[in-house]
């Protein structure tokens, strides 16, 4: 069977605090700088991608799932479009429990080159909807102990989704985040991940970086906030690497 072309990419990890939303925001910004028409969908009821981009919205993902047209719900930010999370999204967690393909149906004719789905840090119905809608998954992993176990658990979930809901789904790559090369632990974790998962691990590593950490408080991507910082350079390289993997599909 031919592999599906990757256009929709879920960013997923059941563990919070691994740089998932930071990656979603900044990957979107640099993919847009590569000339792609990009939509970022904030599926986390906490709305961190939405607030981190300085957007306040009354309507967003929940309203798309209720049948409202996408074009009236998106917000332009730094060269790409954001479909925001709003407080109503908490209710969708219950409503979507029996509808794992609702998001896939709602995004059927979205018209973008690439769609990034920022999933909640849990195996909620919203996360399952993201995995059912995507062709590729990026898994951000913090360079810390237990990283290997966390990735293995998520990959088992991906296999279940592929078997039951979405045979097109595949792992696009594992991304090491919050990396401090001065520590032996970070070096060991990266080495373990590469030894275990091989080419599935992106060559790009996202460093611990003050500018990256502070950018959301200004409502900006790292490309806007500190375009010459190590974090900015890392996400630019990641965007190039993601595009190379997408084009290989």
Swiss-Prot record:
InterPro entries: AAA_dom, DNA_Partitioning_ATPase, P-loop_NTPase. ATPase activity is stimulated 10-fold in the presence of Spo0J and parS DNA (a plasmid centromere-like site or plasmid DNA itself). The first 20 residues of Spo0J stimulate its ATPase activity by 8%. Keywords: ATP-binding, Chromosome partition, DNA-binding, Hydrolase, Magnesium, Metal-binding, Nucleotide-binding. One of its GO terms (molecular function) is ATP binding. Changing residue 20 to A: Nucleotide-binding-deficient, no ATPase activity, cannot bind DNA. No effect on dimerization. Its EC number is 3.6.4.-. ADP binds at residues 17, 19-22, 207, 209. ATP binds at residues 15-22, 207, 209. Mg(2+) binds at residue 21. It comes from the Bacteria. One of its GO terms (biological process) is chromosome segregation. It catalyses: ATP + H2O = ADP + phosphate + H(+). Monomer in the absence of nucleotides or presence of ADP, in the presence of ATP is found in a monomer-dimer equilibrium. ATP-binding is required for DNA-binding. Probably interacts with Spo0J. Belongs to the ParA family. ATPase probably involved in chromosome partitioning. Cooperatively binds dsDNA, forming nucleoprotein filaments in a strictly ATP-dependent fashion. Can also bind ssDNA with lower affinity. This is Chromosome-partitioning ATPase Soj. It comes from Thermus thermophilus (strain ATCC BAA-163 / DSM 7039 / HB27). The gene is soj.
């Amino acid at each position: 069977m031919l592999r599906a072309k990757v256009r929709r990419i879920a960013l997923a990890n059941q563990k919070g605090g691994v740089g998932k939303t930071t990656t979603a925001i900044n990957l979107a910004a640099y993919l847009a700088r590569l000339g792609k028409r990009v939509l970022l969908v904030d599926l986390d009821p906490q709305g961190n991608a939405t607030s981190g981009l300085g957007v306040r919205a009354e309507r967003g993902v929940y309203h798309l799932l209720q049948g409202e047209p996408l074009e009236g719900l998106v917000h332009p930010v730094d060269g790409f479009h954001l479909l925001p999370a709003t407080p109503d999204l908490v209710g969708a967690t219950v409503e979507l429990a029996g509808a794992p393909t609702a998001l896939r149906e709602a995004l059927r004719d979205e018209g973008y080159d690439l769609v990034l789905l920022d999933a909640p840090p849990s195996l909620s119905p919203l996360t399952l909807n993201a995995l059912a809608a995507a062709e590729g998954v990026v898994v951000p992993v913090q360079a810390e102990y237990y990283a290997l176990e966390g990735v293995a658990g998520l990959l088992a979930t991906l296999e279940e989704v592929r078997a039951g809901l979405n045979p097109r789904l595949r792992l696009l790559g594992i991304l090491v985040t919050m990396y401090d090369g001065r520590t032996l632990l970070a070096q060991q974790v990266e080495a373990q991940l590469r030894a275990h998962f091989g080419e599935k691990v992106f060559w790009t590593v996202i460093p611990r970086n003050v500018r990256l950490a502070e950018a959301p408080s200004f409502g900006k991507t790292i490309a806007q906030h500190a375009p010459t910082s190590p974090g900015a350079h890392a996400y630019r390289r990641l965007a190039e690497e993601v595009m190379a993997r997408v084009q290989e599909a």
